[in-house]
């Protein structure tokens, strides 16, 4: 039987050779049938300590490595780039100022 694989974001890298990965999934509410986001955190083994906070990683189920570790990092899908986040915030701010300048927001 193939091992389960999940994709998530690294939320902590403070431990040696271990990262905490937050995995989001959509779950349908049993009564209201609305889809709700659920987040679960997994401790994953990072052999070379290459993962940093904000990285998008793929983790795979493995044998128990410790009391809480049952997953290992397979690969880093995307590195976290703080410059990109700052640039996106600046672009959004410029769009807001442009809309307000045209009279889009009335008080």
UniProtKB/Swiss-Prot annotation:
A Pfam family hit: Ribosomal_S17
Keyword Mitochondrion attributed: no
Q: Which domain of life is it from?
A: Bacteria
Q: Name one GO biological process term.
A: translation
Q: Which GO terms describe its cellular component?
A: cytosolic small ribosomal subunit
Quote the InterPro entries the UniProt record gives: NA-bd_OB-fold (IPR012340), Ribosomal_uS17 (IPR000266), Ribosomal_uS17_bact/chlr (IPR019984), Ribosomal_uS17_CS (IPR019979)
One GO molecular-function entry: structural constituent of ribosome
Task: Tell me which family the UniProt entry assigns to this protein.
Answer: Belongs to the universal ribosomal protein uS17 family.
Record's NCBIfam families?
A: PRK05610.1, uS17_bact
Query: Oligomeric state and partners?
Result: Part of the 30S ribosomal subunit.
Q: Write out the function statement from the record.
A: One of the primary rRNA binding proteins, it binds specifically to the 5'-end of 16S ribosomal RNA.
| Name of the protein in question | Small ribosomal subunit protein uS17
Supply the source organism for this entry. Thermotoga maritima (strain ATCC 43589 / DSM 3109 / JCM 10099 / NBRC 100826 / MSB8)
């Amino acid at each position: 039987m193939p091992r389960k694989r999940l994709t998530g974001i690294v939320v902590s890298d403070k431990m040696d050779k271990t990262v905490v990965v937050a995995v989001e999934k959509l779950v349908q509410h049993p009564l209201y049938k609305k889809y709700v986001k659920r987040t679960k955190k997994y401790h994953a083994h990072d052999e070379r300590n290459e993962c940093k906070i904000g990285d998008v990683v793929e983790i795979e189920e493995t044998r128990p490595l410790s009391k809480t570790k049952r997953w290992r990092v397979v690969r880093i899908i995307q590195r976290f780039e703080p410059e990109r986040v700052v640039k996106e915030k600046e672009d959004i701010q410029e769009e807001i100022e442009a809309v307000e300048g045209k009279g889009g927001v009335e008080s």
